[in-house]
Amino acid sequence: MTSTTLTPAVPAPDPAGAPADGSAQPPAVVFVHGMRTSGAIWERQVEHVRALGHDAVAVDLPAHGARAHERFTLDRSFEVLDEAAASFGPGRRVALVGLSLGGYTSLAWAARRPANLAGVVAAACTSDPKGKPVALYRDVARLVVVGGGAVGRGARWAARTSGAAWSAITRAGRSLPGGGASSHALAGPGDAGAAHRPAAPGWHVVTDALTQLAGRSWLAHVRDVDVPVWLVNGARDHMRLDEQRYLAAAADAALVVVPRAGHDVNSEAPEAFNRVLGRALADFGRGRGARLGA
């Protein structure tokens, strides 16, 4: 297990060589987005890995993007990943790259030890989403869903309660578990100002996702993963809270912290993230059982 802080001087090794398992092709890459975004957030990364010689696809999770009509569940999310992996053809090795909700989903899917999985890059997801702050946030989100956007005195109460939930989460040292930026999630579905969030899903996906996440231990999932795991965090992300525990739990892992980046590390520091991605894909090409960094 290794831990490092990324600096601009660190070059990315060329990952385009033949994988150690003898496959004629480098692993394909499946990108998995965070809460209330879509596969569109990965545009720069998809372009980057394709230039390195990897096939790639960025999926939309249930309740997001092209699957906005579906309810979010982990079981349905696993089906989406199954379909994406199978789309590259039988026997093709696949690497997962997930951010936040997508990172948690990727780790849980990888813990099932699917055939032909080469490795996982799990970004912004090293804090188990559990406890009273998360439950409070989920309950506030559910209230907004049931109320359909309360008005008058109810709206003011909801706003105050939302603020209390946010304060509790930040006091606990956490960003919104599973989501993109906590700030835009608290603002509701009408705040999609970022270019990569043209149509953010509504509050129902927050309640559904947090309900799904809160009942699991992602540390346990990390322990069950039998391929290399690269943990990538922005230095300013509160979700770094348990990164050392996640690093210690994994049988084969690396931790990279990107300076000056926050939760949405792939879009806040795309060049740095792409360098990390290149290094991770090169690592995934080595034979299982080799020492990390050897």
What kind of region is each of these model predictions?
Residues D21-A66:
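Conserved HGGG/HGGXW glycine-rich cap/lid loop of the alpha/beta-hydrolase fold
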Residues G98-G102, S106:
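Gly/Ala-rich beta-loop-alpha elbow adjacent to hydrolase catalytic centers
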Residues A261-N274:
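Catalytic histidine-centered segment of alpha/beta-hydrolase-like enzymes
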Residues P228-A261:
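Conserved loop-alpha-helix segment in the C-terminal half of the alpha/beta-hydrolase fold
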Residues A111-R112, L117-G152:
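Flexible "cap/lid" loop of the alpha/beta hydrolase fold
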Residues S175-A220:
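Hydrophobic, aromatic-rich cap/lid helix
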Residues V32-G34, L99, N233-G234:
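The conserved beta1-alpha1 loop
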Residues D14, D55-V97, R275:
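Active-site loop/oxyanion-hole signature of alpha/beta-hydrolase fold enzymes
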